[in-house]
Design a protein with these regions (language model features):
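Feature recognizes metal-dependent phosphohydrolase scaffolds
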Residues: 1-171
Length: 173
């Protein structure tokens, strides 16, 4: 029971933070993933693509209906402690550095394309163009620019470039 409550709490924090990022970057066209503002906590429903669904769980004490994506003070404290723990964990940092040194979002091996994640496609199977900070990319070019931003998110000393890279990492993982 405690595990379920912890999972629910951290999931709500995740949805709030994702919602903030999606609102900050409308060019990513991910608005359909923001659902907290579509919830009616009094009725216990959520509207998804114009259809109203009942919620299985109606207890969301940390969601403010007037500002559903705002973290509570306690949630913010959890996020800050998690960030500190991740940044200061040498084993994790060593692992991340290894992945960035040896890894890639894609690789061609023995004539086969190995890739991480999903490749955005149109209905006809052609590559979908994705807007990344005002520029459109698709296919290999998209993966190259995403990898570029992943590395900036970790290595860049410029605060703005680092933030852009981290935003990309968070939204596309």
């Amino acid at each position: 029971m405690l595990d379920e409550k912890m999972h629910k709490a951290i999931s709500i924090i995740q949805f709030k933070l994702e919602g903030q990022l999606i609102e900050k970057h409308p060019e990513f066209h991910m608005e359909d993933r923001r659902l907290l503002h579509q919830m009616d906590l009094e009725k216990g429903t959520v509207v998804i693509e114009g259809v109203t669904y009942p919620l299985k769980d109606k207890c969301f004490p940390t969601i403010d209906p007037k500002n559903p994506y705002q973290l509570t003070a306690e949630e913010n404290d959890v996020v800050e402690r998690l960030k500190t723990a991740f940044v200061n964990c040498e084993r994790l940092q060593k692992h991340v550095r290894f992945l960035l040194t040896k890894g890639s979002l894609y690789k061609v091996y023995n004539g086969n394309l190995l890739y991480h994640g999903c490749v955005p496609l149109n209905e006809d199977g052609t590559f979908t163009e994705v807007d990344i900070y005002g520029e459109k990319y698709s296919g290999k070019e998209l993966y190259d620019v995403l990898e570029h931003y992943v590395r900036k998110g970790y290595y860049s000393l410029d605060k703005e470039e680092k933030k852009k890279g981290l935003d990309i990492c968070l939204l596309y993982t």
